Every structure is written in C-alpha cells, then in structure tokens.
C-alpha cells in the first residue's frame, strides 16, 4: 500500500515535536519554521492543548452538533474573548478550504447574487469552490469548469476595484497573500476595497486561515488596516495543531442561515472544540499576540541587517511571524541547505523562502536561522559565479 504523495517529499521522517522544535527518526533536532505550513504557531505539544485534548478524548470524541456538550459552552466563552469585531457567531469545520466554501455559499445566499471577485495570485484552497477563487492555473485549470462566475482583479491595485459592482456577491481577499510570496495588502488598497464593497452591497470576506490568530502580530490581520470584514475564515493556528477551521459571522448574516444550508459530519466535533478552547486560553495566558508582534519585528530586523549586502536578496517582507525572504532564484537549493543545517522552512511563490515559526522562538533561534540562511545564500551564489 502506498500513500499518494501530493506534496513534495522532504526526505525526513519526523517522530516528535516540542515547542519550536521537531526531531527526526535518528534523533536530530530541527528548528521548525515550516510548522505544517503555519499550523503549529502555538508550538508543538503545547501543554494546555494537550491537556484539553486528553481530557476530552477520555469523555467523548465524536458527536453531531445536533447535541450539546459542556465543551461547546466552554469553547463559546473562550471564543467570545478573541472573536473578530462584530462577529458573534461561529461555524466550525475541519479545514481552511471548507471554511472558504462555507463563506462563499453564505455570501451567495445572503446577497442573492452569483458573481465572486478574487485576486490574482490568491490561494484559498483546493476543493471546487475555493479552487475557483485560487489564481494559480496549475492548480485550477485541470479541474475546470469550476464554480463561477469568478473574476480576478489585480492585488493592491485600487483602480481595478471599479470592477466590483451591484452584481457582485462577495469579494474574497487574503490580507497577506501567503502562497504567492508573503505579499501584504496596502492600507490604502484595503480601505478602498472596504468602501467599494459597502457601496455595492457586496460582502467582504477575509481569508485569515494563515494570517489569523496572532500570526501577524495582531489577533486578526484585518486589524492592521483599521477595517472590519463582513465574514472571516480562520484555521491553522486556531486549533493548536488539531484540524479545525472557523467561519465567523455577524448576527445580520448568521440569522439568515437555516438548517441544511451547510453541514459537516466532523465539523464542530468535541475534540475540535476542545482544541479551539485550549488555543484561545494559550493566546490569552501567554500574551501570544504581543510576543508575535515583538519577535516578528526583531526577527525581520535581524534578517534585513544580516542579508542587506547580498545581491541575491530582493526583499525581506511580511508582518509579525509571517516572513518572506524574496531571492533572485528558485529557493529549492536554499531550503535543502537550511534543512541540512537543522532548519525547516517552506517555499512561497516562485522565489520566496517563507518562515512561519512558533511564537516560542528565541533571539538565539533568530540569530541561528539568519546566519545559516546567509551561509546558504552565499554558498549557492558563489557556486553560480564559479560555474
């Protein structure tokens, strides 16, 4: 029996994780800036999350949301402290792509419109609806026709927003485009986008699967822009490593949803609720958001200073602990070098090395990663010159 390999094989067998580190089968420790593409933001085997999951597993692990359970009440109280502004309702699902699907369906029902606006270079998932609003033709074209009509506008281009009209059901946007290269939205662009959706009666969906729950140095990345979306999707970090996603909705939208409008066999299971409850408690108890903000600024400053003289480095960008190092060639060799030296990172776009560390990283971790990255870039640069 073989597992279908849908992601590139890194050639490592990982057997354990703890805080900001993982260990391979030979006992070697790695500094984890991959974190399951941003999932383990709260650290591997976080003790609070472990405790909640163990306790819930000993009681009941699966239950339809037709039934109530004590962990649901505790989760709702915990979520109430971290919820996006004006969003008092949550729908629990299992993955980021499912949350996007639910958000798109909700927008169509609420507005009675069909057209969806997304942005070039966006990534929202690989199921039919979310794939329809994902830009990369490599992912999308083999499976067309998909859900439509969808129109892609140019990210950070205010003039292009004129194409949002009274037939638009929703505009879906990542505050920082992650998969395409860690590209933050401009403040002016986001404010213009919010104004345009309000004027046309379109719903503004923020896909915060990767940016949300403290990763960018704000609890939610929309807070960088002083606007509030109509719908927000969260995932990855919000489960502390457990597969769960959340769609947050305000009352005026949630109250129009009816039984059967959406559903999920596993969505909102007691284990997922326990994970979300625990993750919310970690965020509050450990002052995670402020740590991500301070450490993110510190790490970016270290990288900028250490890489400033390298011609192969175009830019260091991002927010908080979502950092991209844009280089002048494909990053495969650099990622391999980092891994050989005990640091796991991930590619973004065609030329970006993406660092998505846990909030638990230390100054020493930052220095080590920056120095190893510099060594790797110099080694590859010198090799290219000599050849």
Curated annotation (Swiss-Prot):
EC number(s) given by UniProt: 2.6.1.118, 2.6.1.124
Superkingdom per UniProt: Archaea
Pathway involvement of the protein, from the record: Amino-acid biosynthesis; L-lysine biosynthesis via AAA pathway; L-lysine from L-alpha-aminoadipate (Thermus route): step 4/5; Amino-acid biosynthesis; L-arginine biosynthesis
PANTHER family from the UniProt entry: ACETYLORNITHINE AMINOTRANSFERASE, MITOCHONDRIAL (PTHR11986:SF79), AMINOTRANSFERASE CLASS III (PTHR11986)
UniProt-annotated binding residues for pyridoxal 5'-phosphate: 96-97, 123, 207-210, 265
Protein name: [LysW]-aminoadipate semialdehyde/glutamate semialdehyde transaminase
SUPFAM superfamilies documented for this protein: PLP-dependent transferases
Similarity annotation: Belongs to the class-III pyridoxal-phosphate-dependent aminotransferase family. LysJ subfamily.
Localization (cell): Cytoplasm
Catalytic activity: [amino-group carrier protein]-C-terminal-gamma-(L-lysyl)-L-glutamate + 2-oxoglutarate = [amino-group carrier protein]-C-terminal-N-(1-carboxy-5-oxopentan-1-yl)-L-glutamine + L-glutamate; [amino-group carrier protein]-C-terminal-gamma-(L-ornithyl)-L-glutamate + 2-oxoglutarate = [amino-group carrier protein]-C-terminal-gamma-(L-glutamyl-5-semialdehyde)-L-glutamate + L-glutamate
InterPro entries referenced in this protein's UniProt entry, alphabetically: AcOrn/SuccOrn_fam, Aminotrans_3, Aminotrans_3_PPA_site, Class-III_PLP-dep_AT, Class-III_PLP-Dep_Atrans_LysJ, LysJ, PyrdxlP-dep_Trfase, PyrdxlP-dep_Trfase_major
Gene: lysJ
The UniProt record lists the keyword Amino-acid biosynthesis: yes
